[in-house]
């Protein structure tokens, strides 16, 4: 066990984490030269394309150090994005060390800071690596200073490296051997293994990536998953070098995979503890929590006949994505579909993109909404995921909305516009610090304001230089109201929205005027109204198409013309009583595109 080193890599998107992993694998001879491809560990197309890591991956490498001993290095590649922060914390808790990779030309970014603090909280030894030293604009001194100022770890002995050219790779490996502590654990004790990640394989079922903390696991052992209480027979154990290689056993301190013929991913939850059914451990490992979706949206097939196909596609996605939740939902306007819960906006985009790309589905997505807590007059607390489920105004004592803590980093010339944006989004400034040219802002902002378009607006006001990261804080009472849209007096459930009262009239007027442009003219007047409860706060009319009934009257008596007009009016009134208005698809999308002024 003295020769095992478990470490992971923390980096912001595009700071060279996956390329560095490739170099380390190459240097330790993990893959033959012909099997090397760029970003070996990012196995999904969408991961390579977007340049992000979604699922955790591992590689067990053998490295002959300068002191002549052979060390087993286990590299655990973590996702870097804020939506997957729970997966990051599980990956980090399986390690004793972490490489903090910082782009020497760009300095520290928000997500790096968040993940680095997670690592420090878990007691992981952090080694700084300044990457991309081959770039002409690299500034190692500035980056080193920033790491010390912003994160507060000693960067005087940071390794200068370039994953692209291969410079500094040996120094990194030596630093890992010298500075990362070897794992603690007792191979004799009862088995405790942490599930770092799990995914579904079409041939063998669920594959679990685990870190053995105590004890030994061999094939044919009967295992117990402590959170779900399920028991399974362990069929195969092994390690990834990134290719899978079976091993006769996994013992304390090692990282490897287990196949136990589990059919459903929901049984193998990330962060759960595995122990032996015959000789269980006294307590599970700390830190397990159920992942709760934060953002909800409705997904509907464009062709209602594809409903079953959409359900199958979502079920297949769920096999590999335990955080995705969905339940059937019916909307008067869009027909049958699903209400889906996601970890955050990136997660939502990825699910949509995978549905379109891997399953060839055409889908419509309704506006993302967040979960509100509603306290009724009699004291019951409801969680509301969709505006159509909000109880009547008279029954509500208070509504609480989720607040998130947002960390922002940007060059100082963009502080003004970014602060204006945060204040417009009902943000509350908590902190502001200067680190050289970079500014670090902390805000508390309602999640509902962030899910609409905060990220895009942030990138545009800062010309792409600002980076953000957010974490859920708590629910707080808020003055939010449900705005219903009525067409000719009928409520349209799919168009309802929950907005802050101060913003309600503006939003209502804007949506109503957009709807007016989109609903085609009928043979009678159509009234589009927005209402809070019974109070109408905005209205537009779509004028009727009408025939000129006076065309045949030349001169003559006025009463003749009156009679014809009255007759036309009565006819239109009858039509209005029986007619229904078709709402085109674009009208639903109009609701999504309303900007808050």
Curated annotation (Swiss-Prot):
The lineage of its organism: Bacteria, Pseudomonadati, Pseudomonadota, Betaproteobacteria, Burkholderiales. InterPro entries: EF-4, EFG_III/V, EFG_V-like, EFTu-like_2, G_TR_CS, LepA_C_sf, LepA_CTD, LepA_IV. Its EC number is 3.6.5.n1. HAMAP family: LepA. GO terms for biological process: positive regulation of translation. Belongs to the TRAFAC class translation factor GTPase superfamily. Classic translation factor GTPase family. LepA subfamily. One of its GO terms (molecular function) is translation elongation factor activity. The keyword Cell membrane applies. Pfam families: EFG_C, GTP_EFTU, GTP_EFTU_D2, LepA_C. SUPFAM superfamilies: EF-G C-terminal domain-like (SSF54980), P-loop containing nucleoside triphosphate hydrolases (SSF52540), Translation proteins (SSF50447). GTP binds at residues 14-19, 131-134. Required for accurate and efficient protein synthesis under certain stress conditions. May act as a fidelity factor of the translation reaction, by catalyzing a one-codon backward translocation of tRNAs on improperly translocated ribosomes. Back-translocation proceeds from a post-translocation (POST) complex to a pre-translocation (PRE) complex, thus giving elongation factor G a second chance to translocate the tRNAs correctly. Binds to ribosomes in a GTP-dependent manner. It catalyses: GTP + H2O = GDP + phosphate + H(+). Keywords: Cell inner membrane, Cell membrane, GTP-binding, Hydrolase, Membrane, Nucleotide-binding, Protein biosynthesis. The keyword DNA-binding does not apply. It is found in: Cell inner membrane. It is an enzyme of class 3 (hydrolase). Residues 2-184 form the tr-type G domain. This is Elongation factor 4. One of its GO terms (cellular component) is plasma membrane. Its main location: membrane. NCBIfam families: lepA, small_GTP. It is a peripheral membrane protein.
